[in-house]
């Protein structure tokens, strides 16, 4: 800035540091800023140079930690003898050291590593020092002139010596320049306004006035000032305080919204499934397992609990099962679903045993093909699994000391199938009306006399297929005594020696009642 007689270019800087590496780095950086640099490794040597050339340096940059003299001691000597601006620097930025440097008269405190941007503006300290001297001599009362000169010279220096346009800030420069020109006129000197301190009583009056008017756009500074009735308070003071008060209220509203939102998220985390799990755990029920039979294998077991905790056998249709807290219901189904049948189950699902097929033994002297006894039967292994002979063990274990739970909770209400047992069968409902009795008997390798008519069999016998069993039951001719008939068969077929899925111990110990007209032509 040539008009004021000061230019940042060629600023004379004395750098004091005991580290030669940092001396070289700072020397290169300062020279890039077009400064004249002098380096020194000892504080006493730097003090000697300053005394010899009192007007030879504009600013001093010194390290705090020096081997021969403390950096703060050097700062005191320079401030008392030469009155030059001194910048202190160090590796650590402890608050105590920074405050000590400011108290001893340091104009700035830099931390290593020092940036180029910080070195480019050290000339401002020199300019402020000179302006302060001018104000002290001429009695200049305007304090904004130094700031304006600082900003203008900084823009001039960083812009390469060219004028830099600041847009709207240019008006501020013109205004401050005009004030500098009128500094010699006492009447034109501006006085700084006193800052208003909002005490508790004053703020209480302000809040009451706002509440009377309403905290909205209608609450203007003029109305509030009239209601407060404070003589020395201005409209600008009320407007500034009103703006801060509205910002405070908006922050409170945002805080409430965040609390409400966080509370809503926490309540939404509890899903209906959790409620269902809790209620299912507290109120156990009782039911039985039901299995659907058919030719197709299990298609899919959906959503099985990965941690099986209870086990139960299917031998008892109404078995009590101890169930842990469950998260999802288990459903086992077949495609296509056929009739339901209940059977005993002891083997696990993954172990499907080989099916044993019994071959009947043919007797030449009997017109009926007799089924062999278990000791006489020959079995053939079949690799195809049979659902009627598979025995299952669901992956649940019964914990000790648990509560009884109804197993019907495994099935959805619409998927529950009534259980059918031998005692619940209705003979009239299980009749095979569409089959010829003769064809059925021939398929079982039964030999019939040639003179026998199949019509009589259909009319006399009321044959019923018991589901889940392997024989026909004559349900029509019941409660009739034929024990005195001499025409009873001498040999009773072995397959008729089964009753209720259990084989009789000895066929000779029991007398069977057979219709005399069963095999008479």
From Swiss-Prot:
Tissue expression profile of the protein: Detected in the whole plant. Predominantly expressed in roots and stems.
Molecular function terms, GO-annotated: DNA binding; DNA-binding transcription factor activity; phosphorelay response regulator activity
Chief site of localization: nucleus
Gene Ontology biological process terms in this record: cytokinin-activated signaling pathway; regulation of abscisic acid-activated signaling pathway; regulation of jasmonic acid mediated signaling pathway; regulation of root meristem growth; regulation of salicylic acid mediated signaling pathway; response to cytokinin
Subcellular location: Nucleus
Domain Response regulatory, first and last residues per copy: 12-127
Gene3D superfamilies, per the entry: 3.40.50.2300, Homeodomain-like
Span of the annotated motif Nuclear localization signal: 192-195
Quaternary assembly: Binds the target DNA as a monomer.
Family statement drawn from the similarity comment of this UniProt entry: Belongs to the ARR family. Type-B subfamily.
Role of this protein: Transcriptional activator that binds specifically to the DNA sequence 5'-[AG]GATT-3'. Functions as a response regulator involved in His-to-Asp phosphorelay signal transduction system. Phosphorylation of the Asp residue in the receiver domain activates the ability of the protein to promote the transcription of target genes. Could directly activate some type-A response regulators in response to cytokinins.
Name of the molecule in the record: Two-component response regulator ARR11
Naturally occurring in which organism (per UniProt): Arabidopsis thaliana (Mouse-ear cress)
């Amino acid at each position: 800035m040539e008009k004021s007689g000061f230019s940042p270019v060629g600023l004379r800087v004395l750098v004091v540091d005991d580290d030669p590496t940092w001396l070289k780095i700072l020397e290169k950086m300062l020279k890039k800023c077009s400064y004249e640099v002098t380096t020194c490794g000892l504080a006493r040597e730097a003090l000697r140079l300053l005394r010899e050339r009192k007007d030879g340096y504009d600013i001093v940059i010194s390290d705090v930690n020096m081997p021969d003299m403390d950096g703060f001691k050097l700062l005191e000597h320079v401030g008392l003898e030469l009155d030059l601006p001194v910048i202190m620097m160090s590796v650590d930025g402890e608050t105590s050291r920074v405050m000590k440097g400011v108290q001893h008269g340091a104009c700035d405190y830099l931390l290593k590593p020092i940036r180029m941007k910080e070195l480019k503006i050290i000339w401002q300290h020199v300019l402020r020092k000179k302006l302060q001297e001018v104000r002290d001599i001429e009695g200049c009362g305007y304090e904004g002139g130094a700031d304006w000169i600082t900003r203008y010279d900084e823009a001039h220096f960083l812009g390469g010596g060219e004028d830099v346009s600041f847009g709207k800030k240019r008006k501020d420069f013109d205004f401050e320049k005009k004030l500098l020109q009128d500094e010699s006129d006492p009447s034109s000197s501006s006085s700084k306004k006193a800052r208003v301190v909002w005490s508790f009583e004053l703020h209480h009056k302000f809040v009451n006035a706002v509440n009377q008017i309403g905290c909205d756009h209608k609450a203007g500074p003029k109305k509030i000032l009239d209601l407060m009735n404070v003589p020395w308070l201005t409209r600008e003071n009320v407007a500034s305080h009103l703006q801060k008060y509205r910002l405070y209220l908006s922050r409170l509203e945002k805080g409430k919204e965040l609390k409400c939102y966080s509370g809503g998220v926490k309540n939404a985390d509890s899903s209906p499934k959790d409620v269902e799990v809790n209620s299912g755990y507290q109120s156990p029920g009782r039911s039985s397992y039901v299995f659907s039979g058919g030719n197709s294998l299990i298609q899919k077991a959906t959503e099985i609990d990965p941690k099986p905790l209870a086990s139960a056998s299917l031998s008892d249709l109404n078995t009590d099962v101890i169930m842990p807290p469950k998260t999802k219901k288990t459903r086992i189904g077949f495609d296509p679903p056929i009739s339901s049948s209940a059977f005993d189950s002891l083997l696990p699902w993954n172990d499907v045993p080989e099916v044993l097929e019994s071959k009947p033994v043919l007797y030449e002297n009997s017109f009926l093909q007799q089924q062999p006894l278990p000791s006489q039967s020959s079995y053939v292994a079949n690799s195809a699994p049979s659902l009627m002979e598979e025995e299952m063990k669901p992956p649940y274990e019964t914990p000790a000391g648990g509560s009884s739970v109804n197993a019907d909770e495994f099935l959805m209400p619409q998927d529950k199938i009534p259980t059918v047992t031998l005692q619940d069968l209705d003979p009239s409902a299980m009749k095979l009306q569409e089959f010829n009795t003769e064809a059925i008997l021939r398929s079982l390798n039964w030999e019939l006399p040639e003179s026998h008519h199949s019509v009589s069999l259909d009319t006399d016998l009321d044959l019923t297929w018991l589901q889940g069993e392997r024989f026909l039951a004559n349900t029509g001719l019941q409660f009739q005594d034929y024990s005195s008939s001499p025409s009873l068969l001498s040999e009773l077929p072995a397959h008729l020696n089964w009753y209720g899925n259990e084989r009789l111990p000895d066929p000779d110990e029991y007398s069977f009642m057979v219709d005399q007209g069963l095999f008479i032509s």
